[in-house]
Design a protein with these regions (language model features):
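N-terminal binding-site loop/beta-alpha segment at the start of enzyme catalytic domains
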Residues: 1-93, 97
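Glycine/proline-rich, positively charged
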Residues: 31, 99-113
């Protein structure tokens, strides 16, 4: 069984992180839309299970995953978790029917730009 509470030092970067990470693409409504309450309950369960390494990206729900993760981690002690993300993809606002690639698989709420 993986130990989600054990922090280990990464051999090349010197960072400490848990053996298992939590990928947050589903919090950005990947394949299926979920409510904010469902996202929060999922994160609560992950935290209670010892999860402390979270991975996100701006592409996950066009920022929805990051927004939900931010709301959750805001009150957590900063030295208790590790957060990773990705950069480099330029996202341009477009209508849902104009989405291509991975973006068409996320059910993204409409936002005012």
């Amino acid at each position: 069984m993986l130990n989600t509470r054990h922090w280990d030092r990464h051999k090349t970067g010197g960072l400490n992180f848990t053996e298992l990470g939590f990928g947050t693409a589903p919090l950005g409504n990947l394949y299926k839309a979920i409510s904010d309450a469902e996202a929060r309950a999922t994160l609560d369960q992950a935290w209670e299970s010892g999860m402390r390494y979270f991975d996100t990206a701006p592409l996950y729900g066009l920022g929805l995953s990051e927004t939900r993760l931010n709301g959750f981690l805001r009150d957590k002690p900063r030295d208790q978790y590790l957060l990773s993300s990705k950069v480099g993809r330029i996202m341009k606002p477009c209508a849902p029917e104009a989405r291509t690639g991975l973006g068409k698989w996320f059910d993204v709420p409409q936002r005012q730009e």
